[in-house]
């Protein structure tokens, strides 16, 4: 209905000139029209639906359609013209009009155009203003179209009026010409002041006009009546205006602008707006004219002008290109439009209109809801030019131009008014048909839908096709403009509603021509055109003369048949082309809404013709343009080349685009292999193997690697069967990571599996990002992705089974976390320099490529056996733009390595976040454990604050701007202690660490600056000796986790060799010792035994890893029964074959045990620890670290203690470093049984300190990989706090240990500390301690870390262990307090065993207090007591008054005692480490 309304309106406009009703409404009430237009805005919405119904007769619909588009385009055109050059436009228009239509204007004016003109003038003035505004907005493209459409509209309206009134057809056409001229003049005069306000009103006015146009309106009376009933504004013109109005300022302008943008943002309509200068050429004239014609047409023929405008706009786009068409249009704006002059105005108008329509359509189409359907449809018809532009517009425009040329020739031949009008009509019709055929091809599918909802669908269809058409029009604007000028103007009128179908325009024209005899001639050409459309170029010109005869016959008859043709038409276009379908349907719907009776035959014929023409046109558009140029010498020549090129390109472009889309679709599937297309990639990969021939995705991915494999096979082409899977080495976010060997080359690779079964959205976005980013990063320190393979050779199977992709990486033997936790490696300062140098080079490269890694942690730093480091796992990486900082999520980077700005909610972060993570890794390389281990963000921030100081504006001015600054404040203000805590590391490294761990990200050093630091600037990687890495064992995170789990469950792998632990042991052990010493004044010997209970548990954990179930059972029995066993017996029970070293240790242990027995059971514990210490080469200084319960070193002098020690030693012996750990564990467990042994003559605080941290670490390690490397971890586990041991043990073992611990609470604390210290060095070196560091080592930290370390999946187990341990620890606490170790000593008691861990636990307790709860805290407290020395200072406050006291004072006291073993300064360092590292591990 919108189209019908438009047509009706336009017919009213031009037909109104011929019909009395039009003048009365148009001339009588231009103001009323404005009102109507205003009303029509509202009615437009109403009319949208009613228009959809299609009440208006075909004629009325056509008129309404034409008028609406004209109004819309006029508004735009007129506004643009007014802004650009009203005067020039007016003068051009006047000249053209005068040239064309002096006679016509006289006749038309006499007939009824005086009134009509006045009303139209008002409307046009308003419209002109509107159009000018719109044109200004649309500037170039809209102007051209506007001018073309307005001229065409004028011609079309005149012609249409003639067609409407056969009697007054010629008179009307003349009068319409004169009227147009007058209206243009009036418009020009009025447009200045009425520009915008009237442009909107004009829309309404054209509605009135449309309503008034009786001939065509009557033909479309049903629709018109409906529209009229809705106030005439809803009537064809009203609806058209209604649409225009509702959309009018926005839609008309926007639609116009949108169309111009859509078709050619700066093409016709903008040209027109720009065209004041451009007007001078015919193109410019048309543009100028388009505004003035708009005004005129808006007023006099404004409805028609608008309607035609749409068709004209189509040609107008082309005419807009060539000045001559515009000039021609201007000169003969009403009827000369048939000729080049008339065409030029019409085309320019048409261009305006088509754009205007296309905007309306596009708007409508963009929002189907915009159902000012009559207007919409009219716009659709109007929009047909839009269709013309690119898709079918080229072909359609070419044919139309040919028709226009033919029409021009016919017009030239038929100088008579009728002849002129008929030729114009014919060319216009033909051109319209061509255009519309193109449009139809575009719109055909749409048209089918639009039949259902003609208004909406048509609008949408037209809108969609229009942009394409516009492009084509832009290309072949001139031609189309000329063709459209003659043919489209009328076609648009007639086809305003039928825009989609070329038949509709012809039909409308036929109606007009039926009114006139010459127009009748047009009818025959229509059939001719039907066949010619395929020959758009040549056929249209010849047809132009015949066309006039055609209209008379089909004019009225066709209207009734129209409905039947419509369906065929829609069908035909659909079958013909996708382009055609969209076009015909809108027309069909328009026609049906108009009165399907008008051009059914024509519609079907035109549909076919337009389909054929549209399709052939696109292809043969160049050919049609060639003939056309002769017809329109000035414009056509220029247009034809342009059109020819554009039309073919348009079609080809469409096809190519479609092909590209298809190819692109396959590409994403291929991308999975190499590209990051998420949705398609999964299938494509599977598909790609079969489709290998055109795997573009491999090409996409290949460029990065350019390996022989890529030439051999594209990404995704190969199947994972080409690899032999060796084993699992990791677990990613979307699958496992496998170690595999390439069957062809024999090289080792890592296969990262990307599963799609759980992906609802196809390929995981993280995998896509990783693929895209890795393809851009080529650096020796960034892991290299070789290719992508699928797990199914057959694409169908892949799709059916939801297969997976595998990212193929070069294989790296280890990752940093696995090595650190394994305890198998000791990194020297040179090694650390080498690692950091490579890491920072890779990071600096990424940052210079503008990528943020956002997930730097030890497990993502890969090493090979040659000491080469590579940065891996770019799944969280994102492109970073410093200039356009955009917010990203702050939930990135593993918690332990997350910088304070992310914890405080910063979303616009910088590469400094990665530098912080690397600083954490630097500290970890020295401490062998994560320096900040918490399981909650608040706890993590607390740990950072303790080491680096509290975030405050003094040191970090912008911190107050962060979202969580007020909600995440630490419990208290801390000063920066980093240099104190890490005083043991080289000064150059300390300086670098200090800069990398700066709170303020703006002051933090960059990756590039780190490379210039004293620590790294002189590092020459080529001269660095590679570290002695374990070639027999690949140390990966997963392996480390499993190892930890095993240790925790009691099956274990003994702690790692002591070699690595020495450093960590020393530091953490020392710290632990001081804590232990603090609790009891003379706790040197006691500490080792004090910890036996927890130590035993830890030892058991280590032993369990080493021992089988039966051996474990024996050990547990021994521990539980605490029966006296000799060391040899223990060895036998444990099936330990002691090597000479172990035997020596055992002997030493026996001696120690004897001494201890003499002294006390505690001494025995110490002895057992002493052997461990001896293993670690840490002489046990008889420092009694009095555990809470067993402050006396006599407690565990019993054989049971000896047995425990032996068991621990034996278990450690079983494994390379296990013996020491096991001894400790056994001693710890046994000691816990005897409770007596508190004093370890030799095992002193070192061991105790070392042991305790280990104990706690296990608890906290749970988050980390469950166990350290099985063989090397024994000492650490043994050394690990007893609490950690239980954690590592299975529930049964844990329960037994708990019982033992509860019985000998006093004993374990003292004993374990020594053992811990001794074991600790081993553990640290083995990374068993580090393991704990992650999960267990830092008792307190790990307690907290457990959540963090949950990543490592030990978290839950450790937490349970911790909970269980806490019970024991609590007992210890009780015993400690019993012993007189105040509550603060409680911490100390626990500190006893957790030399390293205690501190962590102490800290953890703080965190735990808030997070985990008292039990955990207590358990941590006990375990922590060992670690306490390290963590105590920080943790004490949180552990509780007692703990705090123990930590602060106890630590100080113990510092003296432990100093004996470790040396106070070192211990301080160790302590710092625990705090910084393990201590930090303590969550709180």
Swiss-Prot record:
Residues 1-13, 87-106, 120-161, 183-196, 225-234, 427-455, 483-501, 513-522, 650-662 have a biased composition (Basic and acidic residues). Gene3D superfamilies: Phosphorylase Kinase, domain 1 (3.30.200.20), Transferase(Phosphotransferase) domain 1 (1.10.510.10). Keywords: ATP-binding, Isopeptide bond, Kinase, mRNA processing, mRNA splicing, Nucleotide-binding, Nucleus, Phosphoprotein, Serine/threonine-protein kinase, Transferase, Ubl conjugation. The modification Phosphothreonine is found at residues 57, 511, 688, 889, 1240, 1242. Residues 72-84 have a biased composition (Acidic residues). Residues 723-1016 form the Protein kinase domain. The active site is at residue 855. Pfam families: Pkinase. The modification Phosphoserine is found at residues 235, 248, 264, 273, 275, 300, 302, 309, 311, 317, 322, 324, 331-333, 337, 340, 342, 344, 382, 384, 399, 419, 422, 610, 640, 677, 681, 885, 1049, 1079. It catalyses: [DNA-directed RNA polymerase] + ATP = phospho-[DNA-directed RNA polymerase] + ADP + H(+); L-seryl-[protein] + ATP = O-phospho-L-seryl-[protein] + ADP + H(+); L-threonyl-[protein] + ATP = O-phospho-L-threonyl-[protein] + ADP + H(+). One of its GO terms (biological process) is regulation of MAP kinase activity. Phosphorylation at Thr-889 increases kinase activity. Its EC number is 2.7.11.22, 2.7.11.23. Cyclin-dependent kinase that phosphorylates the C-terminal domain (CTD) of the large subunit of RNA polymerase II (POLR2A), thereby acting as a key regulator of transcription elongation. Regulates the expression of genes involved in DNA repair and is required for the maintenance of genomic stability. Preferentially phosphorylates 'Ser-5' in CTD repeats that are already phosphorylated at 'Ser-7', but can also phosphorylate 'Ser-2'. Required for RNA splicing, possibly by phosphorylating SRSF1/SF2. Interacts with CCNL1 and CCNL2. This is Cyclin-dependent kinase 12. It comes from Mus musculus.
């Amino acid at each position: 209905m919108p189209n019908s309304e438009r047509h009706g309106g336009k017919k009213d406009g031009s037909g109104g000139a011929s019909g009395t009703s039009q003048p009365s409404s148009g001339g009588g009430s231009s103001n009323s029209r404005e009102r109507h237009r205003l009303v029509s805005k509202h009615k437009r919405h109403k009319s949208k639906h009613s228009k959809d119904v299609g009440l208006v007769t075909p004629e009325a619909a056509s008129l309404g359609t034409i008028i609406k588009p004209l109004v819309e385009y006029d508004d735009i055109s007129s506004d643009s013209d007014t802004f650009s050059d009203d005067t020039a436009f007016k003068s051009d228009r006047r000249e053209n009009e005068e040239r064309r239509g002096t006679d016509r204007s006289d006749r038309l004016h006499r007939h009824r155009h005086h009134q009509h003109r006045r009303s139209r003038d008002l409307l046009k003035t308003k419209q002109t203003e509107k159009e000018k505004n719109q044109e200004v907005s649309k500037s170039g493209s809209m102007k051209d179209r506007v001018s073309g459409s307005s001229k065409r509209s004028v011609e079309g309206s005149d012609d249409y009026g003639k067609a409407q009134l056969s009697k007054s057809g010629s008179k009307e056409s003349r009068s319409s010409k004169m009227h147009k001229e007058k209206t243009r003049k009036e418009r020009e005069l009025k447009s200045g002041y009425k520009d915008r306000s009237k442009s909107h009103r004009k829309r309404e006015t054209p509605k009135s006009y449309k309503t008034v146009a009786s001939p065509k309106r009557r033909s479309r009376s049903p629709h018109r009546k409906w529209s009229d009933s809705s106030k005439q504004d809803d009537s064809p013109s009203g609806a058209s205006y209604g649409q225009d109005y509702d959309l009018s300022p926005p839609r008309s302008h926007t639609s116009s602008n949108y169309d111009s943008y859509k078709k050619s943002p700066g093409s016709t309509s903008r040209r027109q707006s720009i065209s004041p200068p451009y007007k001078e050429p015919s193109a410019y004239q048309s543009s100028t004219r388009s505004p003035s014609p708009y005004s005129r047409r808006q007023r006099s023929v404004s409805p028609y002008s608008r309607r035609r405008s749409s068709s004209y706009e189509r040609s107008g786009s082309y005419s807009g290109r060539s000045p001559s068409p515009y000039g021609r249009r201007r000169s003969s704006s009403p009827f000369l439009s048939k000729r080049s002059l008339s065409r030029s105005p019409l085309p320019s108008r048409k261009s305006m209109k088509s754009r205007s329509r296309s905007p309306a359509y596009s708007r409508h189409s963009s929002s189907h809801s915009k159902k000012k359907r009559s207007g919409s449809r009219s716009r659709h018809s109007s929009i047909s030019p839009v269709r013309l532009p690119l898709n079918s517009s080229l072909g359609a425009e070419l044919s139309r131009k040919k028709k226009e040329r033919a029409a021009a020739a016919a017009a030239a031949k038929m100088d008579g008014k009728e002849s002129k009008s008929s030729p114009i009509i014919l060319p216009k019709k033909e051109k319209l048909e061509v255009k519309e055929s193109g449009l139809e091809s575009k719109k055909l599918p749409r048209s089918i839908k639009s039949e259902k909802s003609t208004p909406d669908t048509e609008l949408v269809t037209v809108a969609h096709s229009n942009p394409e058409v516009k492009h084509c029009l832009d290309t072949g604007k001139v031609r189309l403009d000329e063709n459209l000028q003659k043919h489209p103007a009328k076609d648009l009128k007639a086809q305003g509603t039928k825009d989609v179908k070329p038949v509709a325009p012809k039909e409308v024209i036929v109606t007009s021509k039926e009114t006139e005899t010459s127009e009748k001639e047009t009818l025959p050409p229509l059939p001719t055109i039907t066949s010619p459309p395929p020959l758009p170029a040549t056929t249209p010109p010849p047809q132009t003369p015949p066309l006039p005869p055609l209209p008379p016959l089909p004019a009225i008859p066709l209207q009734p048949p129209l409905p039947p043709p419509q369906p065929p038409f829609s069908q035909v276009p659909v079958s013909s082309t996708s382009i055609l379908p969209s076009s015909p349907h809108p027309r069909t719907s328009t026609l049906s809404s108009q009165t399907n009776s008008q051009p059914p035959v024509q519609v079907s014929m035109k549909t076919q013709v337009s389909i054929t023409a549209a399709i052939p046109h696109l292809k043969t558009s160049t050919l049609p343009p060639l003939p056309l140029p002769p017809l329109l010498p000035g414009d056509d020549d220029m247009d034809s080349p342009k059109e020819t090129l554009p039309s073919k390109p348009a079609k080809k472009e469409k096809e190519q685009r479609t092909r590209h889309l298809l190819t692109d679709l396959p590409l994403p599937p291929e991308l999975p292999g190499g590209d990051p297309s998420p949705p398609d990639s999964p299938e494509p990969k599977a598909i790609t193997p079969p489709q290998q021939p055109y795997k573009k995705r491999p090409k996409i991915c290949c460029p990065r690697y350019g390996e022989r494999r890529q030439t051999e096979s594209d990404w995704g082409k190969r199947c994972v069967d080409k690899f032999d899977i060796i084993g699992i080495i990791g677990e990613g976010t979307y699958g496992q990571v496998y170690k595999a060997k390439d069957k062809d080359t024999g090289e080792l690779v890592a296969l990262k599996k990307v599963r799609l079964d759980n992906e609802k959205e196809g390929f995981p976005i993280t995998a896509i990002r990783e693929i895209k980013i890795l393809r851009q990063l080529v650096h020796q320190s960034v892991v290299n992705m070789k290719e992508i393979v699928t797990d199914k050779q057959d694409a169908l199977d892949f799709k059916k089974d939801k297969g997976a992709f595998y990212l193929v990486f070069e294989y790296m033997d280890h990752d940093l976390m696995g090595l650190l936790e394994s305890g198998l490696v000791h990194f020297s300062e040179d090694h650390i320099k080498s690692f950091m140098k490579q890491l920072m080079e890779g990071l600096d490269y990424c940052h210079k490529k503008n990528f943020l890694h956002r997930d730097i942690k030890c497990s993502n730093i890969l090493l090979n056996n040659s000491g080469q480091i590579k940065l891996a796992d770019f799944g969280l990486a994102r492109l970073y733009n410093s200039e356009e900082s955009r917010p990203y999520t702050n939930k990135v980077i593993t918690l332990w390595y997350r910088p304070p700005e992310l914890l405080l909610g910063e979303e616009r972060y910088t590469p400094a976040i990665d530098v912080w993570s690397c600083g954490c890794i630097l500290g970890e390389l020295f401490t062998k454990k994560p320096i900040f281990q918490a399981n909650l963000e608040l706890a993590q921030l607390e740990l950072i604050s303790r080491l680096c100081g509290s975030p405050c504006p003094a040191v970090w001015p912008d911190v107050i701007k962060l979202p969580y600054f007020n909600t995440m404040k630490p419990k208290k203000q801390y000063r920066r202690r980093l240099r104190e805590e890490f005083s043991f590391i080289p000064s150059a490294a300390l300086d670098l660490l200090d800069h990398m761990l700066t709170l303020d990200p703006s002051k933090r050093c960059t990756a590039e600056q780190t490379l210039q630091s004293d620590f790294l600037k002189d590092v020459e990687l080529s001269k660095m000796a590679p570290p002695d890495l374990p070639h027999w064992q690949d140390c990966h995170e997963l392996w480390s986790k499993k190892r930890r789990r095993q240790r925790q469950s009691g099956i274990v792998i003994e702690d790692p060799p002591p070699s690595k632990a020495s450093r960590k042991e020393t530091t953490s052990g020392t710290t632990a010792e001081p804590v232990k010493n603090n609790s009891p004044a003379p706790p040197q010997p006691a500490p080792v035994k004090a910890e036996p209970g927890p130590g035993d548990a830890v030892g058991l954990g280590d032993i369990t890893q080493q021992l089988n179930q039966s051996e474990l059972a024996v050990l547990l029995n021994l521990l539980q029964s605490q029966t006296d066993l000799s060391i040899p017996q223990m060895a036998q029970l444990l099936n330990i074959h002691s090597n000479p070293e172990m035997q020596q240790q055992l002997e030493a242990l026996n001696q120690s045990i004897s001494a201890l027995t003499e002294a006390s059971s505690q001494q025995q514990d110490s002895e057992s620890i002493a052997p461990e210490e001896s293993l670690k080469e840490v002489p046990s200084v008889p420092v009694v670290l009095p555990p809470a319960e067993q402050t006396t070193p006599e407690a565990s002098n019993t054989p049971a203690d000896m047995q425990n020690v032996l068991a621990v030693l034996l278990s450690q012996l079983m494994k390379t470093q296990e013996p020491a750990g096991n001894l400790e564990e056994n001693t710890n467990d046994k000691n816990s049984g005897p409770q007596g042994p508190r004093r370890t003559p030799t095992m002193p605080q070192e061991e105790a300190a070392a042991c305790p941290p280990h104990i706690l670490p296990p608890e906290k390690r749970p988050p980390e990989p469950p166990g350290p490397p099985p063989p090397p971890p024994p000492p650490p586990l043994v050394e690990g706090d007893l609490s950690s041991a239980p954690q590592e043990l299975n529930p049964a073992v844990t329960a037994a240990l708990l019982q033992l611990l509860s019985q000998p609470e006093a004993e374990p604390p003292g004993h374990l500390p020594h053992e811990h210290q001794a074991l600790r060095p081993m553990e640290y070196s083995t990374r068993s301690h580090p393991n704990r560091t992650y999960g267990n080592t830092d008792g307190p930290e790990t307690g907290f870390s457990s959540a963090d370390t949950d990543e490592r999946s030990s978290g839950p187990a450790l937490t349970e262990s911790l909970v269980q341990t806490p019970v024991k620890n609590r007992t210890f606490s009780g015993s400690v307090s019993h012993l007189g170790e105040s509550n603060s000593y409680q911490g100390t008691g626990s500190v006893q065993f957790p030399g390293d861990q205690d501190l962590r636990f102490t800290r953890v307790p703080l965190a735990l207090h808030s997070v985990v709860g008292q039990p955990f805290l207590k358990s941590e407290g006990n375990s922590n007591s060992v670690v306490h020395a390290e963590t105590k200072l920080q943790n004490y406050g949180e552990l509780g008054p007692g703990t705090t006291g123990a930590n602060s004072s106890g630590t100080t006291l113990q510092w003296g005692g432990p100093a004996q073993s470790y040396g106070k300064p070192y211990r301080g360092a160790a302590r710092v480490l625990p705090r910084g590292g393990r201590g930090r591990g303590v969550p709180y």
